[in-house]
Amino acid sequence: MVDTQTDSPTISNKTLVLAMLLAGACSYLLPILSVSSPRMTSLHADFAGRSDISALNDKIEWLTQKRAIDNLTSTEKTALDKELETATNFLIDQLDTPQQALPFQRSSPQTLPPFPAELDYDVFDKSQSVPRLFISRMPALDKEDAQRRKQQFIQIMLPLILKVNDEISTHKQVIMTALKSGNEDVLDAFARKYGLSKLQQSREQRRLSLQIRVQPIPVEIALAQAAVESGWGQSRFTHEGNALFGQWVWDVSKGIKPAQASNSRAAVRAFPDLISSVRSYMTNLNTHHAYEAFRKRRSELHLSGDIDVSGLQLVPFLYRYAETGSEYVETLTQMIKQNELHKLASRKLPSGGVS
């Protein structure tokens, strides 16, 4: 596949005192230590998988929803505006922090954890909530029953995909607020985050590009690609390096070398946990030039009023994801149809507040 992203990020060792940023919206605080930054005090918590960014995303979403309440007093609005600005600035600081790849510990298929009973839910039954459970490593799936194995894979992947899509939706919400208020600092940070900083664009072009790039990935596409690229979670790259989407890295120290590879430096990118793999995959589709047509068509469908964009409408624009081109598109199409993944397009995570 085409992938020239930077490596999966980690949080630096710099830390700072940050009193009560996440208080009020959650029952806990991020671990906090101390240091200063040129622009403002910056948050650097040593959380694998960037869970501090997730918490800030949730915090911003919670504050935005609370700010929209009609009967707030002017004092309450002012306090919420200030807290929202602080949380947004911390998010900017995180987006701007230079990050390096987290080391991964190669795991053995013989030591796969058991499938968690808490994830044994009916993915197609909309009366059942998708659990807010985000496991870090692929467990042992059913070896005897292929249908049951597929079901378990979807049960694991669906919460992860929905979680990262929620994060992207929060980014989108913050960007829309910044567009309305003219907050160029926020827009600059997201331009860097979504690969626009190197492009020679006017501010108006950058704003349009952000609106095109910062969009969730259709659930059925993410599930289908994860199933195809990981062999329904059975590939050694998934077991040993949490690699779900067959992304490449040109440094064997940061990935797992395939048995056969035309380039001696090529390896399948490894990740510290499964959600990092999902984040990297979605960032790739939302930023790499190979998927520009995919993003453009997605945006056109949104602008036409198609709020819940169908994955089947976008699959043809992923022909550059694999060397097989049109054959790969057909494989994804059949994967979605045969496994009825399109029926999961409207699934959402239950509201969990800041978690």
Residue ranges and their predicted role:
Residues 2-224, 228-355:
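Catalytic cores of secreted/periplasmic lytic hydrolases that degrade extracellular macromolecules
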